[in-house]
């Protein structure tokens, strides 16, 4: 099954050195002067030079059809940098660029194409460094320390625009209608695309395109744009420009999963782990005032406090939402961790998941049938696995070459320290007991008797997320576990990658000459008391999976060194990110949802109350993207995920799925 494969572009370079698509027999940019044409058609056609200084919002959003070589984006980024240098006090502070590409270039072809424009090299090199793997869906790239956001949507634009979340409606300030010429690629230039452009355009939004084809002009007019012709670039006689002068009212296709944000820019985050830390950074980048309340006397005392944690994507043999979310989350996490200006112990040494018995082999075979890019995951036979991991296991599996391990405790503390430098206020030894809605604010009450008032609140406090009246009905559960710390030996030190089986074993951390092996799993148990039986079982699972491996017998847990923590999980293994749903209102308002879908109102939620939780055992993989999703939602900005996958992360999903089928919610 090839549902997760994206076909890269096949191209050649002509005599002028211009890339030409073999699939469409068309150039990616003009042989004459592609850079100047971009400036004239797209920047000039949208009047960006005159609009930037008077833009009344901190963010300007541009959407594009056909990313190609990225010439339009790089040219715009260069112009935006010049604007920011000339107008440092302007309201407009950040640029958000959304682009769709069916056949993305390889990184090597991208670099070759960029050689055409030496003046764009400072921006092109940053793009090349973060160029994503050819996975379907949205890839968010945070560039220029977060001042520029690039959302690359890989896939067919006419399919992708139908999958966009409703929060993107009426957000785009300018459209770059680009791509191969209509005569070369008629499948793209459709009424469906023109209608999607109109749906996403805010009132007053503009568009520009190089073509003057009559059917394009008429299609855009019918969609709602006011169109006019303009002199074309160079030898081209005409081009088209447009303005969205209407105020369209798009309908919500799935109001029960609708996400609402806040016009306010002040929040309290409850928690102290990696999710809280990364969310703080994401909100601060958007200009929020953030106060972090942590029950402990320092960060990373809960599930984020381990010495080594594996980073690799969760894949499923049958769950499409898991297979859409986790590969994207993993690649985003790697980009974010690499870009963070903080230090923490880590090694992107790779992760190999082994098929040690028939059941695990079948599971891995089904995962490999997803046809994921080799840069994300690929098959290994027994011999290849031994070469990759450095120890003998006598079984093959699946390897994640970009995975590895990191120290969650160090990462969490470093990120919170960085956020504090950027304005984060921290309040340690503050255990929240209740939340009380007071007009348009939330009052927080703590065990000390102290209270605080905030415009919005985010619950990101791990397995304690359902301790409040508003969250008590959430279908989440605690999972206690113990990770053992073992000394390295000459045989164990040969391990080069994180090894996953019916447990996991990390390579040694050179800073302490120890490995981590784990982890036990006790559903419903919130105890953090060390257990001798867990220590023994962590070792025994390794021996049971690899009974002939002599190196495995050197695992020594007798030192009784371990760390106990509690995860927060869900039945479907996906996080919960978004508005905190109002359980009783949901059941009341949606009692007849199965029979009245067309008249359903937006999902009942607690205004200004959000959550980021249920990260399970994959928080290091999912927390970065979840934090970015929630920060974007709270800020009413584009969310980097399709509507279907976002629905699978909605905290109300398990209730709504039953209500949609007319089943009782228990």
UniProtKB/Swiss-Prot annotation:
The keyword Methyltransferase applies. Pfam families: DAO (PF01266), Methyltransf_30 (PF05430). Its main location: cytoplasm. Residues 270-666 are annotated as: FAD-dependent cmnm(5)s(2)U34 oxidoreductase. It catalyses: 5-aminomethyl-2-thiouridine(34) in tRNA + S-adenosyl-L-methionine = 5-methylaminomethyl-2-thiouridine(34) in tRNA + S-adenosyl-L-homocysteine + H(+). One of its GO terms (molecular function) is oxidoreductase activity, acting on the CH-NH group of donors. GO terms for biological process: methylation; tRNA wobble uridine modification. GO terms for cellular component: cytoplasm. Keywords: Cytoplasm, FAD, Flavoprotein, Methyltransferase, Multifunctional enzyme, Oxidoreductase, S-adenosyl-L-methionine, Transferase, tRNA processing. Its cofactor is FAD. It is found in: Cytoplasm. Its EC number is 2.1.1.61, 1.5.-.-. It comes from the Bacteria. Signal peptide: none annotated. PANTHER family: SARCOSINE DEHYDROGENASE-RELATED (PTHR13847), TRNA 5-METHYLAMINOMETHYL-2-THIOURIDINE BIOSYNTHESIS BIFUNCTIONAL PROTEIN MNMC (PTHR13847:SF283). Catalyzes the last two steps in the biosynthesis of 5-methylaminomethyl-2-thiouridine (mnm(5)s(2)U) at the wobble position (U34) in tRNA. Catalyzes the FAD-dependent demodification of cmnm(5)s(2)U34 to nm(5)s(2)U34, followed by the transfer of a methyl group from S-adenosyl-L-methionine to nm(5)s(2)U34, to form mnm(5)s(2)U34. HAMAP family: MnmC. In the N-terminal section; belongs to the methyltransferase superfamily. tRNA (mnm(5)s(2)U34)-methyltransferase family. This is tRNA 5-methylaminomethyl-2-thiouridine biosynthesis bifunctional protein MnmC. It comes from Salmonella typhimurium (strain LT2 / SGSC1412 / ATCC 700720).
């Amino acid at each position: 099954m090839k549902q997760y494969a994206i076909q890269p572009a096949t191209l050649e370079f002509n005599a002028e050195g211009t890339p030409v698509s073999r699939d469409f027999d068309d150039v990616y940019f003009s042989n004459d002067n592609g850079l100047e044409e971009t400036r004239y058609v797209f920047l000039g056609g949208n009047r960006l030079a005159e609009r930037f200084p008077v833009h009344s919002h901190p963010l300007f959003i541009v959407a594009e059809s056909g990313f190609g070589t990225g010439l339009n984006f790089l040219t715009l980024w260069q112009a935006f940098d010049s604007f920011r240098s000339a107008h440092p006090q302007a309201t407009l502070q950040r640029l958000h660029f959304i682009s769709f590409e069916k056949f993305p270039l390889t990184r090597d072809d991208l670099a070759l194409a960029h050689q055409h424009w030496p003046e764009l090299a400072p921006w092109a090199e940053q793009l090349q460094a973060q160029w994503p793997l050819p996975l379907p869906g949205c890839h968010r790239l945070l560039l220029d320390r977060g001042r520029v956001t690039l959302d690359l949507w890989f896939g067919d634009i006419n399919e992708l625009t139908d999958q966009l979340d409703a929060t993107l409606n009426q957000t785009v300030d300018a459209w770059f209608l680009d791509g191969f010429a209509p005569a070369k690629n008629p499948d793209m230039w459709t009424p469906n695309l023109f209608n999607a452009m109109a749906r996403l355009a805010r009132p007053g939004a503009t568009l520009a395109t190089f073509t003057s084809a009559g059917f394009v002009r008429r299609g855009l007019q019918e969609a709602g744009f006011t169109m006019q012709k303009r002199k074309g670039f160079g030898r081209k006689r005409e081009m088209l420009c447009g303005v969205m002068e209407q105020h369209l009212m798009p309908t919500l296709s799935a109001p029960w999963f609708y996400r609402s944000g806040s016009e306010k820019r002040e929040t309290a985050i409850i928690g102290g782990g990696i999710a809280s830390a990364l969310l703080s950074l994401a909100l601060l980048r958007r200009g929020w005032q953030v106060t972090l309340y942590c029950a402990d006397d320092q960060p990373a005392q809960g599930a984020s406090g381990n010495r080594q944690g594996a980073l690799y994507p969760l894949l499923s043999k049958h769950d499409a939402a898991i297979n859409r979310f986790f590969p994207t989350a993993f690649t985003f996490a790697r980009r974010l961790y690499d870009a963070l200006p903080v230090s923490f112990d880590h090694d992107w040494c790779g992760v190999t998941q082994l098929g040690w018995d028939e059941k695990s082999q079948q599971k891995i075979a089904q995962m490999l049938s997803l046809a994921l890019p080799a840069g994300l995951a690929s098959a290994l036979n027994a011999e290849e696995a031994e070469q990759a991991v450095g120890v003998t296991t006598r079984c093959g599996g699946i390897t994640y070459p970009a995975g590895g391990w990191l120290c969650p405790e160090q990462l969490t503390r470093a990120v919170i320290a960085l956020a504090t430098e950027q304005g984060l206020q921290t309040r340690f030894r503050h255990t929240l007991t209740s939340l009380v809605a007071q007009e348009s604010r939330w009052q927080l009450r703590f065990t000390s008797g102290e209270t605080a008032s905030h415009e919005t609140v985010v619950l990101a406090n791990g397995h304690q997320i359902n301790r409040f009246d508003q969250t008590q009905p959430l279908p989440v559960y605690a999972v206690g576990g113990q990770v053992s710390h073992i000394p390295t030996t000459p045989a164990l030190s040969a391990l080069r990658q994180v090894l996953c089986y019916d447990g996991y074993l990390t390579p040694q951390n050179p800073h302490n000459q120890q490995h981590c092996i784990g982890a036990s799993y006790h559903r419903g148990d919130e105890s953090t008391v060390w257990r001798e039986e867990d220590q023994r079982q962590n070792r025994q699972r390794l021996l049971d999976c690899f009974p002939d491996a002599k190196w495995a017998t050197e695992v020594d847990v007798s030192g009784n060194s371990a760390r106990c923590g509690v995860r927060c999980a869900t039945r479907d293994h996906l996080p919960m990110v978004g508005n905190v749903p109002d359980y009783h209102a949901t059941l009341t308002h949606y009692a007849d949802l199965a029979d009245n879908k067309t008249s359903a109102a937006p999902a009942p939620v607690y205004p200004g109350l959000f959550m980021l939780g249920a990260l399970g055992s994959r928080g290091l993989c999912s927390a970065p993207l979840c934090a970015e999703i929630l920060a974007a939602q709270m800020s009413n900005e584009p969310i980097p995920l399709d509507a279907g996958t976002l629905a699978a992360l909605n905290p109300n999903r398990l209730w709504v799925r039953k209500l949609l089928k007319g089943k009782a919610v228990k």
